[in-house]
Each structure stands twice: as C-alpha cells, then as structure tokens.
Amino acid sequence: MIQKTLFGKVQSEWVQPDHFPDLSKYDEISIDLETKDPDLKTKGSSSTRDVGDVVGIAVAVKDWAGYYPIAHEAGPNMNRKQVLAWFSDVLKTDSLKIFHNAIYDMLWIHRLGLTVHGTVVDTMVVASLVDENRFRYDLNSVANDYIGMGKNESALQEAAKEWGVDPKSEMYKLPAMYVGEYAERDAEITLSLWQEFKKEINSQDLHAIVELEQQVFPCLLEMKLKGVRIDEDQLTRVENTLQKNYDKYMKRVKEDVDFYPEIWAAASIEKVCQVRNITDFDRTPKTGKPSFTKNYLKNHKDPVLRAINSAREADKLKNTFLDSIKNFVHNGRIHADIHQLKGDFGGTVTGRLSYSNPNLQQIPNYTDIGMGVRSIFVPEKGIDVVVLTILNKNLGW
C-alpha cells in the first residue's frame, strides 16, 4: 500500500456522498465500477480468479450521480456493508441498467454476490451496431463523437503522476477524492450516450438487432462465469507428447545436416538447404531473402524439410497454444473473454462470437496432433460433446 499524505499539490473538489438515495423511481440507471484488476492485461478480468476487488461504485441517473468508494488502498472509504446493501437495492429495480463494456462490470457485480434485475444495455455493443466501421469503441472516443463529451482525466492523471502510479491500472492506489469525479463522469457520459443512441436506433431501425444482442448477453455472461472444463493431467500428457515429437524431428534433422537449425529462422533453414543441395525455395521480392512457407516445407520431397515442418507444428502447438492455455487455467477451468461484436478488446464486425484470453479460435483442426490438443477440453459430468462442422461461405463485394 502506498503511504502518502492526502494533501499533495493536486486539489480535488469532489465530495463523498453523504446519503444513499432511493433510485426506484428512475427508468434508467447507469453504472460504472472502478476495480483492482492486477492481471487484466495478461490474463483478462480477475473477477473469475479470486483476485482483485471492486474499489468503488459510480451510479448516475437523470439528475444525480455519485461515487461510493469501498476499497481504495489510500482511502478514505465508506462503509462497505452499507454501500453494497444500497447498491443491491439499486440493482433489484426493474430499470434499465446501462454500462459501457457491460460484461466486465457484470462479472464484478457477480463477484460481489449481487444480482442484477431488469434489462442490461451495453453502449459499447450498441456503438458497434450503430457504426460497425469505427476504429475505436472506448467510452471516451464514442462519447466525444456522438455527444461531444469526454472523460475528465486531467486531475486523475496529475494525481497519478504525483503518487507514482498508473492512472488506469493502479487507480485503486489513489485516494478516492481523485477518482470520484472521474468515475461519476464516466457513469454520466454512459447515460447521456444511451440517450443519443436511442435516436440512432430509431433512425436506423435497429430495434430488432439491439434486442437480440440484449437477449444473448445473459447467456454469454453465464458462459464466461462457468468457463470451459480442462483436464489438466491430459494437458500435461499432450504437452509431453509434443515435446517428444519436437525432439524426435529435430534429432532426425541433426543426423542429416550435423547441426540443429533455428526452425523459425529462414537464414538457418537456408543453411540446411545448402547442405542438402536444395535450391527450389522462393525468395521475397523486396529483399531477396529466402522464404520457407508451411506449404513448401510440408510438401517438399526432401524428408529433412518435412521434418522441420513437423518440428514447427509441435513447437507452435506447445509454446503458442498450450502455454497460453496453462496461463489461463484456474481451478480446472478457463474463463475466456467472449466478444459479442467488434469492440476495443476484440470481436468481429459480422457479429460472430470470438474469444480472447485465450483465443479459443486457435484450437487446432482435426489432424492427429490437433485432436490430441482438443482432448484437453472435457465436457461436464453426465454431458456428451458432439463435434459439428458447419460449411459456410462469406460473400464479399
């Protein structure tokens, strides 16, 4: 915990709320949580891994906004039990609950042991429906473009600099007085953005697709919370098999060329070709350097080049895929991030579901080695898994 006086050079006019208002009369409530999420950049949200915490809750309605700090390391914090009791009442209302990147906040709300009633609106998802060609979907960018409002970050960044912390990932280390105004502003902007998006939904006749995405959301949330079951013993066995395969193929190469090449370095494979009197490989147009594609190595008549390709496959599966899987396993499960639509953290323009942390689209196909990797994913007890392949075509103009 950072030890530092609260009375530094940076001043704040934010005042901590002195009451818990009854919001039951409001039809729309905007919510933004500030969190301590230490592994966010490397493993995704910590909400499913029993680390981190919600440090503050910002709520906004038509004529009021407030930020309730409960776990800032530098304080001051309000009574956690009282705040969560009030927040629970807010969530139990039938009003629309409006978020930007809703699944992130909803996961942390679940972590608090609270339940959300009413329809959940995600302005980041709506932004993608309104304009799928945007480059950025973060709250600041979208709000600036649609309502001319942006985050109030100047005081926060100045305070973070004085305290020697990252203004985003280490916000929880700052005193609440430097975060309160920023957090309230986020909730207010999200609410205002939703008012503008309602106009866009009407003008573009997007009601059906917006409603569809809202209906899908609870299922995606449950999928994220439940996670995918992993057989960790099988993962270790597959990892060992891949290592043995890699060693076997590299030994074969060494026996034929008398050295271990760097299988991902074209210059090193070129030396193998020199030893084997192979000259039919391509060179890049710009630099003239050798190029060794997977297709070239896999289908070459020379067994050494085919062995290099096989070694590459084993190496990639082990170091790129399995190591990534191991990094995300928690209590025998992987809780990958699921993306409904294109957004700042991943996703596709077409609306096809995609994953990150880890990227489950990287699961190998139905080769022998690929099926070995797929075997680490196991169904729930009493459930059978059916493997289906859907043939489809994406038409472009």
Name the predicted role of every residue range.
Residues K62-K97, V228:
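Nucleic-acid-processing active sites and adjacent nucleic-acid-binding tracks
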Residues D105-W108, D138-V142:
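Alpha-helical scaffold elements adjacent to nucleotide-binding pockets in ATP/GTP-utilizing enzyme cores
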Residues T93-S95, G118-T119, G382-I383:
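Short glycine-/polar-rich loops that comprise or flank the Walker A/P-loop
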Residues Y104-R111, K271-V272:
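Phosphate- and divalent-cation-binding pockets in alpha/beta enzyme and binding domains
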Residues T115-E132, D138-S141:
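Conserved beta-strand -> loop -> alpha-helix junction used to position metal-binding or nucleic-acid-contacting
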Residues S30, S95-A102, V387:
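Acidic beta-strand-to-loop metal/phosphate-binding motif
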Residues M1-A71, R134, N144-I147, A155-V373, ...:
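Conserved "right-hand" nucleotidyltransferase catalytic core of DNA-directed polymerases
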